Regions:
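Short strand-turn segments of transmembrane beta-barrel domains in outer membranes
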Residues: 158-187
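Extracytoplasmic beta-strand/coil segments of soluble accessory domains associated
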Residues: 68, 72-110
Length: 391
């Protein structure tokens, strides 16, 4: 017990030191209002208002293709999807209680971007065969995650393999030149377990009786999750997901045809073909220690990056480009004193960066937002529908 506390304090002071180092380096820091963060990896409020869960058994029997198919069928969820699955501008927006501000957590790590449509995670890139559970918390239940989860929380847990090896392959074809191949491989041997998936999707021109719309999409995404277990009490997990897409589509912009800068602009709509690309990668390393059935500690580091661009543009000197990166660290400790009383504490630090941004009107680079949290949360379940939270 003493060793555990010393380890927790050491990590705590290490993070505080790193905060001072970042400030000394001259990076722009934004201190937000105090926020409440929960360390509960699995919520015990199943069946209560504002909480919906699809477990592994339901996922296997539901004939789902991806995580988007699962989420859009949950009660109380309004979903607005834009673009083809995995497309250049594809995203899936969740509305809970009328708010579009939500947080996506995959295997304990926040996975959507802060700001713009990049905050709207594309769930269609996660194959259903990789999912162990999908949970949705409405705004009331998700408020413990802070202002970023005003609309709610979507919490996804991916599979850890059981004993043996299992491989599945799925091939699909359809209209508009659509082809899709999926492979999923799960295995466990002794203290090691792994899960691997890969998907490739191709789609061609859209056409109807009236017109044909030139377009092309070639998307590949894959992921691996490798876990080393130490008995029944601890495990170390490395997760890596990668996405790559190439696109051709018809888009438009507005060009100013007024040569005199002192006069109001005369905007003319231009429609043209463009090539586009998008790449993403997510890397996470987590260590989880279970001291007892009611006490656990999770420490992790993560990094996400995304690069999207139009390769061909009317203005070659200023193509549209967006390059983002997030790096973070968290340490969460939770102790359940009895079924209706849980104490949680920890630290979290993450840095969002705009490495490069360009469009026809502006150019921007090296923008950084640093978020830090040191929290202690005391939760009392007073009744089935009444919860008291102190922080």
């Amino acid at each position: 017990m003493q060793q555990k506390k010393l380890c927790f304090l050491a990590i705590f002071y290490l993070v505080l030191f790193s905060m001072k180092t970042a400030a000394a380096a001259g990076e722009a820091e934004f201190y937000l209002e105090p926020m409440i963060v929960t360390a509960a990896r699995y919520d015990n409020s199943a069946g209560k208002p504002g909480y919906y869960k699809v477990d592994e058994k339901k996922l296997e029997n539901g004939n789902y293709d991806n995580a988007l198919d699962v989420i859009k069928q949950l009660p109380g969820v309004t979903l607005m999807a834009r673009g083809a699955s995995g497309g250049m501008n594809a995203y899936s927006k969740i509305l809970l209680n009328g708010s579009d501000r939500y947080l996506v957590i995959i295997d304990g790590v926040r996975s959507n971007w802060n700001g713009s449509s990049y905050n709207d995670f594309d769930f269609s890139v996660l194959p259903a065969g990789m999912l162990e559970s999908v949970e949705v918390l409405s705004s009331a239940a998700g408020s413990v995650y802070g202002n970023a989860a005003k609309g709610g929380v979507i919490r996804i847990t991916t599979k850890k393999a059981v004993e043996g090896v299992k491989t599945s392959i799925n091939l699909e074809t359809g209209s508009y030149g659509r082809e899709q191949e999926n492979i999923l491989h799960l295995g466990k041997s002794g203290e090691w377990s792994w899960s691997v998936y890969a998907r490739k999707s191709i789609m061609g021109d859209y056409s109807s009786a009236r017109q044909s719309i030139p377009s092309y999409e070639n998307v590949e995404n894959a992921g691996i999750k490798l876990t080393k277990a130490w008995g029944e009490t601890a495990d170390l997990t490395l997760s890596y997901r990668v996405f790559s897409g190439r696109y051709k589509s018809k888009i438009f912009n507005y060009k100013n045809t007024e040569p005199d800068e002192t006069k109001p602009p005369k905007l003319v709509k231009n429609i043209f073909m463009t090539d586009a690309r998008k790449t993403e990668d997510n890397l996470t390393l987590e260590y989880e220690r279970k001291f007892s059935d009611t006490e656990n500690n999770i420490v992790g580091i993560y990094r996400r990056s995304s690069n999207a661009a139009y390769d061909r543009s009317l203005n070659v000197e200023r193509p549209w480009l967006l390059d983002l990166r997030t790096e973070g660290f968290f340490d969460r400790y939770s102790k359940q004193w009895h079924p209706k009383h849980t104490l949680t504490g920890g630290v979290e630090y993450y840095k969002d960066q705009v490495l490069d941004y360009q469009d026809l009107a502006a150019k921007y680079s090296d923008g950084t937002v640093i978020s830090k949290a040191v929290y202690l949360q005391d939760v009392w379940q007073l009744a089935d529908s009444v919860k008291a939270v102190g922080s």
